[in-house]
Structures are given as structure tokens and as C-alpha cells.
């Protein structure tokens, strides 16, 4: 797991990567990118990518790392993301996936004038969702405990 972060004018831009390093080769399994601003609702998640040939639980590991980092290194308590609308209906699957993680729908961002700022921030229209970082972290902790893995940390 690698966390990259840079701060500009009070905004923290981050990238969290899960990868395997072997013999000078790096195989990336997944990553999440986003930014924070100094507010309890300041964790903004922009890009999530999980490769299809990734080992099990890479997604959960990325989410747990993101929530732990936000809770420990920022004053953020809640995260927001936008499931972007697309032509093939993939956004419905994303909304279902994000709900399973612990997010809830807060607004459908469309083409109305009141949505203009959100469209500029997020880069498109879609389903805006919000999640409580502590609740998501607790849910992931329970899932990891139920795996009954015997690997030392």
C-alpha cells in the first residue's frame, strides 16, 4: 500500500495504491484518487480503479486505507463521491456497489442551473453519494475480522 499526498492552498490531493513489487517490477491492483479540504465533509473521492485480475479484497483494502488515512490525517468525517452517468448503465452498478460499501445517495446531479457548480467540481452528471468514514471503517473492520486470516500485520 502506498499513499501519495501533496498539499496546495489547504487542499490535500491524494492517491492510494495497492500493488505488488517483485524483482524490480510493480503490478498495480487498484487505486483511489481524491482530495480533501479542511472540513468534516471535506473528503472528496474522485477516481476508483480496481483491475479485474486483482487478488481478493483489494477493494476493501483500498477503502479501509482511505478511511483510516482520512480519519487519522485530516479532520474529515464524511466522504463524498459521484457515480458518473454513462451510456451503458454502469452507473447503476456503481451506485449499488457504493451502497454496499456504506454510502447513501444524497442528490442526482443533472443539467439544472443549480447543479452547475457540482458538475464543474465532479466533471459531469451522476449520483452524488455521501458516506460516514467511521461507519465505513467499522463495516470493513468487521468484514476483515470475519475472514479469520492468520497473517501477521
Where are these regions (language model features)?
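Non-catalytic substrate-recognition and accessory regions of acyl/acetyltransferase enzymes
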Residues: 1-57, 61-153
Amino acid at each position: 500500500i502506498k499513499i501519495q499526498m501533496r498539499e496546495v492552498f489547504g487542499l490535500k490531493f491524494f492517491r492510494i495504491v495497492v500493488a505488488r513489487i517483485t524483482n524490480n517490477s510493480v503490478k498495480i491492483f487498484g487505486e483511489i484518487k481524491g482530495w480533501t479540504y479542511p472540513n468534516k465533509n471535506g473528503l472528496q473521492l474522485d477516481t476508483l480503479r480496481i483491475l479485474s485480475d486483482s487478488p481478493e479484497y483489494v477493494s476493501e483494502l483500498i477503502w479501509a486505507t482511505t478511511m483510516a488515512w482520512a480519519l487519522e490525517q485530516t479532520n474529515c468525517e464524511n466522504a463524498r463521491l459521484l457515480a458518473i452517468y454513462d451510456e451503458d448503465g454502469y452507473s447503476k452498478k456503481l451506485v449499488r456497489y457504493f451502497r454496499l460499501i456504506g454510502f447513501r445517495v444524497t442528490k442526482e446531479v443533472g443539467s439544472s442551473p443549480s447543479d452547475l457548480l457540482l458538475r464543474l467540481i465532479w466533471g459531469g452528471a451522476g449520483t452524488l453519494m455521501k458516506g460516514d468514514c467511521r461507519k465505513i471503517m467499522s463495516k470493513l473492520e468487521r468484514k476483515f475480522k470475519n475472514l479469520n486470516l492468520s497473517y501477521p500485520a
